Amino acid sequence: MSKIRVHEYAKKHNISSKDLMTKLKEMNIEVSNHMTMLDDEVVNKLDNEYQAEKPSVADEFEVEEKVVRSKKNSNKKKKKGKGNEDKRQENFAGRQQTQTVETPDKITFSGSLTVGDLAKKLSKEPSEIIKKLFMLGIMATINQDLDKDTIELIANDYGIEVEEEVIVSETEFETFIDEQDDEENLKERPAVVTIMGHVDHGKTTLLDSIRNSKVTAGEAGGITQHIGAYQVEVNDKKITFLDTPGHAAFTTMRARGAQVTDITILVVAADDGVMPQTVEAINHAKAAGVPIIVAVNKMDKPAANPDRVMQELTEYELVPEAWGGDTIFVPISAIQGEGIDNLLEMILLVSEVEEYKANPNRYATGTVIEAQLDKGKGTIATLLVQNGTLRVGDPIVVGTSFGRVRAMVSDIGRRVKVAGPSTPVEITGLNEVPQAGDRFMAFADEKKARQIGESRAQEALLAQRGEKSKLSLEDLFQQIQEGDVKEINLIVKADVQGSVEAMAASLRKIDVEGVKVKIIHTGVGAITESDIILASASNAIVIGFNVRPDVNAKRTAELENVDIRLHRIIYKVIEEIEAAMQGMLDPEFEEKVIGQAEVRQTFKVTKVGTIAGCYVTDGKITRDSGVRIIRDGVVIFEGQLDTLKRFKDDVKEVAQNYECGITIERYNDLKEGDIIEAYIMEEVKR
């Protein structure tokens, strides 16, 4: 008899993997997870256990007979008792009259109560409360407001406990959107899956392969519609896939406080191995704290080497189960559709172990996946219902917009009336276009939804005018003192891998007042927009060593208010972070980049050196500014301008979209395509 895995045995005997693992523990048999192999001896023991628990045929027959008899008896009782119905009603009415209202053990209130309201809560007559107040020297009428102290005084006289409720503003519904429901109200929901990985490793092909094999097969006449998410059905269970750019599912949405994804599928090409974006995807998934399933794609290629992929991923703490780890690896060929069913089975297995649940019997809450403005339909938004049930006609607040759900369309283009947890739907009826990652909540009353939506829009406008509270080195010490910061997230970029490792190792050793440094991402090369988005989502500081941010990264950093620190000496980085944590950071000057020029042509002139014919692409270049030469995103020289000319004339500055001639002091190795970045040092007002 061949060996069998835990999840395979569970499936064979129609039980959950979790229940089987519990059973094995009761039998003192150690299993690490659902992929553990069971030998023949253990399988025999389990067979005997489950055989013993099954009732015999005779027992089942006896139970069935009792049920049939009880049904017959109940029918007789029904006939017999029909004539006594009036008497029972009379007795019930009589008992109801003699019942006395019990005094409660505890009452709750918020703000204040009138005498009448307090009497109602205490189950007393208002005249009795007025009399008690009179005895305390307080002249009150039935509609008079009572303060907290008076309410407590009266309630204590009756021996009743008082609790004041703190009302959370409904405009900030994000604070109670994620409140835990009672366990008995929770029901199983489909897992929400995002596919991530390096460019050209087969993410889109895998999504298409899953969609074509599972979605269209079960939907006769259904039109697959791109709404940013879709559902597939496997073994009578559903899985929701987010069809968005991989990183957007984590960064943009997490930056707005939305946790959408339950499971990440990391696609790695078997012939290519781990690439820079693969590492980036791993760091995004780890920062979001979600399980990772590795799909080793392109197994049909002659150069496929899955062992190499496994080996490389162990460096990032993704150890295969076959090697004693807990990461699931699934070999697939997305283009040929091989291994897809196995991958979907593994997703269901992780869902079963993680136990994803939600309460369908409440007003819907969730997150915006995509949104756009359509000429014919107006505002269209794809929503992922994460809790509750959304219905057509529900008043809804989405981010700072509001409206009523006029129509709902499923991922296969069909109109639906209800959408439960983990279901993606496209809705119309909002007054303006929300942003991806905005939270939404349905309400009972349209007037209330409008009021909350308008209040949120006003609050957002006021908040936009104020400063964003992102982490920066300047206010780091103050935040540590106030207890707001327990861990500092850093993103480290450098010109070479050796510098990255040295800097990361040095930074990890810093520990001031129990506040530790956590490096969430490292990389080689220029600081990119993706780094800034991750920093914004994780409230991190970006540190660049011998590298610069590109134009898009700078623009995004200003927009998201992300702190970027650039250095050329490692110990200066360490000193600056330590000084900031100890509250001794006192920068007198701050570097301000004023412009960039691209070298279009070079001329070598005797006794002068290399003259660079440049085109100013951004800002301006001034005669007295410091400059640095950037080649392929890496700083190769830093110094001063020697000459700055327009045609044959010396000039003080050259503005954007103009050409100029530049020479650099003590540097002649200028090449076409180099970027000359000009900067000045400005005094910082403290």
UniProtKB/Swiss-Prot annotation:
The chain positions of domain tr-type G read 188-357
On whether Ribonucleoprotein is a keyword of this UniProt record, the answer is: no
Whose protein is this, by species? Bacillus thuringiensis (strain Al Hakam)
Q: What residue intervals traverse the membrane?
A: none
- What does the entry list under GO cellular component? cytosol
Q: InterPro entries from the entry? A: EF-G-like_DII, IF2_II, IF2_N, P-loop_NTPase, Small_GTP-bd, T_Tr_GTP-bd_dom, TF_IF2_bacterial-like, TIF_IF2
Described purpose of this protein according to its UniProt entry: One of the essential components for the initiation of protein synthesis. Protects formylmethionyl-tRNA from spontaneous hydrolysis and promotes its binding to the 30S ribosomal subunits. Also involved in the hydrolysis of GTP during the formation of the 70S ribosomal complex.
- State the residue spans of region: G4: 297-300
Q: What is this protein called?
A: Translation initiation factor IF-2
